[in-house]
């Protein structure tokens, strides 16, 4: 997947259905991306790179597309895939995963079962046992990788405003969150809108 030359919003949509693999020392975790959010850098008031701000914590966001930007929010580790050329702080937050391999280990790591195991940006990273130290690593050159060949394709994609970013003017309301319609592993999915996971893919 080209993380440098494509529009960040398009990358966020294209990532839906892509297989994520994390190879721990004793366990392999896999799953399919069902929810993403695009963050558009310098002008995006909700983005960590808004206004070109650079601090030690956000250094990875300014690296070349395909870098992993991992940051902690409210004790939860959040994983972003950096997009664009070096120096342009755009990226895609991976918000939720439909799990595949390593499910028993995910249940142990999370202390939860069912859809709650990976239906949020801090939930799936804990389920996959991903450490903060992965920040700054290159996707597919470290323990975390994506598989764009053995992937799934959503039947429908919904665009909506991003989660948890009030008071950011127009950026609060822009439809930069992308979800696989009806997939029960999407965060904050109403039960009435849920479908069987297999029915949400082509």
From Swiss-Prot:
GO biological process: base-excision repair
UniProt cross-references to CDD domains, sorted A to Z: AAG
UniProt keyword annotations, A-Z: DNA damage, DNA repair, Hydrolase
Record flagged with keyword Disulfide bond: no
EC number assigned by the record: 3.2.2.-
Pfam families referenced in this protein's UniProt entry, alphabetically: Pur_DNA_glyco
GO molecular function (one): DNA binding
Leader peptide range in chain numbering: none
InterPro entries linked: Formyl_transferase-like_C_sf, MPG, MPG_sf
EC class of the enzyme, as a word: hydrolase
SUPFAM superfamilies recorded: FMT C-terminal domain-like
Keyword DNA damage annotated: yes
HAMAP family documented for this protein: 3MGH
PANTHER family for the chain: DNA-3-METHYLADENINE GLYCOSYLASE (PTHR10429:SF0)
Family recorded in the similarity comment: Belongs to the DNA glycosylase MPG family.
UniProt-recorded name of the protein: Putative 3-methyladenine DNA glycosylase
Biological source species: Staphylococcus aureus (strain MRSA252)
Lineage, opening ranks: Bacteria, Bacillati, Bacillota, Bacilli, Bacillales
């Amino acid at each position: 997947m080209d993380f440098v030359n494509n529009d960040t919003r398009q990358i966020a949509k294209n990532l839906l259905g892509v297989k994520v693999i994390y190879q721990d020392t004793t366990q392999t975790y896999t799953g399919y991306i069902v929810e993403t959010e695009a963050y558009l850098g310098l002008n995006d008031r909700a983005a960590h790179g808004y206004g070109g701000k650079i601090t030690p914590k956000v250094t990875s966001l300014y690296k070349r597309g395909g870098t992993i930007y991992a940051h902690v929010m409210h004790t939860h580790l959040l994983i972003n895939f950096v997009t664009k050329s070096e120096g342009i702080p755009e990226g895609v937050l991976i918000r939720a995963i439909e799990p595949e391999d390593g499910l028993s280990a995910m249940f142990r790591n999370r202390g939860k079962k069912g859809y709650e195991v990976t239906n949020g940006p801090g939930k799936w990273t804990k389920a996959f046992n991903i450490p903060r130290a992965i920040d700054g690593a290159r996707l597919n050159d470290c323990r975390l990788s994506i598989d764009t060949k053995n992937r799934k394709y959503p039947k429908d994609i919904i665009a909506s405003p991003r989660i948890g970013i009030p008071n950011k003017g127009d950026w609060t309301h822009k439809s930069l969150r992308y979800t696989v319609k009806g997939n029960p592993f999407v965060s904050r999915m109403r039960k009435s809108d849920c479908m069987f996971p297999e029915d949400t893919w082509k």
